[in-house]
């Protein structure tokens, strides 16, 4: 201030008034409740002030859940995780945790929600739904779980065992690989690829032939953002069907919303679904309720 006054940048009155003011307190660090979403907002909407749809209480809960699980998982050299929670009815992002509270050595700054990763077995329910939808499969239809080789490709189940003939619903609940490959071959690779396009799996962007039958076993990549939205779209299809006298919306698989006061436009009611009929979705979701839990958690439903 003295230099400004001596150099006649400010007059004496301004100088004396400035000296009389109390010094401001030191700035406190900004809360890092959801840093990866903050970075996404900054990149997507530069120079714009906006309010997110994040539920503060829920976000704090998942941050704590992630912290506790990270402490356990890192003992097994698992250093990264992500959590995304959407409201199925509004498609709003309620909680967004892009990575674990790990270190820079393990890339804590990387937003795993947006990064493409191997799909593993997460596409199997889509294939099951598609086959139910066209009538080529029923939940109790027996599918073969036997040694299989297709043009030199020989899928294996996780336990390296074969179960013979199993109901399709059981094959999905147990996430059996061999039946999934055989089902994809029966349904049609190209046809399933087009279904994934309808489900907005934008990271699966090479030709169907490039992926081959391994598409159903993690041979492709998708993001948690895209996968979560696809499952939300299926649930939303069922919800709208049940609440609208058996009608559908034309835009069930629209992008998740993270800006407050932006409303999802699912379109006007129609008689045909955007992708899958409600009945096929219902049976798929019921089957997924029977998914085997890890060893030691078999009786989870008694405590839920």
Label for each model-derived stretch:
Residues 77-80:
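Short, small/polar residue-rich loop motifs at catalytic or cofactor-binding pockets
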Residues 27-42, 137-192, 236, 258-290:
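Conserved catalytic neighborhood of penicillin-recognizing serine enzymes
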Residues 1-60, 64, 156, 194-208, ...:
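Non-catalytic, structured segments within soluble enzyme domains
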Residues 1, 5, 24-28, 45-53, ...:
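Second-shell loop/turn segments in exported
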């Amino acid at each position: 201030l003295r230099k400004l006054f001596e150099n006649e940048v400010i007059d004496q009155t301004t100088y004396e008034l400035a000296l009389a003011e109390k010094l401001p307190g030191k700035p406190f660090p900004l809360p890092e409740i959801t840093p990866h979403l903050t970075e996404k907002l900054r990149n997507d909407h530069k120079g714009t002030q906006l309010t997110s749809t994040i539920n503060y209480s829920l976000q704090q809960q998942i941050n704590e859940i992630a912290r506790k699980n990270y402490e356990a998982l890192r003992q097994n050299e698992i250093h990264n995780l992500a959590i995304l929670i959407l409201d199925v009815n509004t498609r709003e992002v309620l909680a967004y945790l892009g990575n674990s509270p790990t270190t820079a050595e393990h890339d804590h700054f990387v937003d795993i929600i947006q990064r493409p990763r191997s799909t593993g077995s997460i596409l199997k329910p889509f294939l099951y739904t598609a086959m139910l939808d066209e009538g080529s499969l029923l939940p109790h239809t027996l599918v073969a779980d036997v040694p299989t080789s297709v043009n030199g490709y020989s899928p294996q189940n996780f336990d390296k065992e074969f179960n013979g003939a199993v109901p399709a619903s059981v094959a999905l609940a147990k996430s059996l690989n061999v039946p999934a490959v055989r089902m994809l071959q029966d349904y049609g690779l190209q046809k399933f690829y087009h279904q994934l396009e309808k489900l907005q799996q934008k990271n699966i962007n090479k030709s169907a032939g490039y992926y081959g039958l391994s598409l159903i076993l993690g041979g492709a990549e998708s993001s948690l953002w895209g996968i979560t939205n696809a499952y939300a779209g299926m649930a939303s299809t069922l919800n709208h069907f049940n609440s609208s006298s058996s009608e559908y919306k034309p835009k069930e698989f629209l992008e998740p919303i993270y800006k407050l006061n932006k409303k999802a436009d699912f379109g006007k009611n129609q008689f045909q679904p955007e992708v899958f009929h409600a009945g096929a979705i219902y049976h798929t979701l019921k089957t997924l309720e029977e998914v085997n839990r890890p060893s030691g958690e078999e009786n989870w439903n008694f405590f839920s």
